[in-house]
Amino acid sequence: MAKQKVRIRLKAYDHKILDQSARQIVEAAERTGALVAGPVPLPTKIEKHSVIRSPFIDKDSQEQFEIRTHKRLIDVLDPSQQTINALMKLNLPAGVDIEIKL
């Protein structure tokens, strides 16, 4: 008999909100008796952009900006219907992207 697994990937620009959301998901799953693996921190994606400061000349004077995308992975092993209902009812903060695979 194959065991069922729910894989949850979280993405956010702010790591504090991301960790708070991961903690809420883990607590909700453990309250219903499911086994939880994680949250596992995945590599942070860093996008860097260089912009010329001057509107006309001076290519040498540039400003650098970066966007960091933090990611976490949570596996819920053998979820019951109660566990799935509890996860669906969670109210997570805005700014957190959630991807769920069964």
UniProtKB/Swiss-Prot annotation:
One of its GO terms (molecular function) is structural constituent of ribosome. Part of the 30S ribosomal subunit. One of its GO terms (cellular component) is ribonucleoprotein complex. Involved in the binding of tRNA to the ribosomes. InterPro entries: Ribosomal_uS10, Ribosomal_uS10_CS, Ribosomal_uS10_dom, Ribosomal_uS10_dom_sf. The gene is rpsJ. Belongs to the universal ribosomal protein uS10 family. Pfam families: Ribosomal_S10 (PF00338). It comes from Roseiflexus sp. (strain RS-1). The keyword Ribonucleoprotein applies. Keywords: Ribonucleoprotein, Ribosomal protein. This is Small ribosomal subunit protein uS10. One of its GO terms (biological process) is translation.
